[in-house]
Amino acid sequence: KSYAGDFTLARSLTAAIETKMRLAERMIEAWQGAPARRPAAFGRLIPLAEEYLKHLKAFERAFRNMWHRHNKPFGLESTQIRLAGQRERTEELIRRMRAFADKEPGSGFPELDDLLEIREGVDMTFPSYRRIAYSNVNS
């Protein structure tokens, strides 16, 4: 039994968070660009979103392995539900990015307009830990 920590778990979590932060930052930059160029800019971000999904799945596997080494089987399902939700949100993001890049009617990310507003004197134009950690923009 190792007490030094699970470096596979730590690396996979770090890779997932770092990639998610880069994706959020680049999505904001793409949305702040010229409206006519937004679809192509989002299309170029699809590989980064897919990279995040890959890291998220690696973290899921590493977390499951760590859990079974150190805990009883019950209890894991609550974390599995959360991670499955995060995975599905990411897959939906990729679908929406593809639709926007293909200029499908009704596609886009109008919620980013709200995100980029200055609220209560706080500049919301950068990714914050709270939005990233809780995977929504309303926190």
Regions found by a protein language model. Name each.
Residues K1-S139:
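Catalytic domains of carbohydrate-active enzymes that cleave complex glycans
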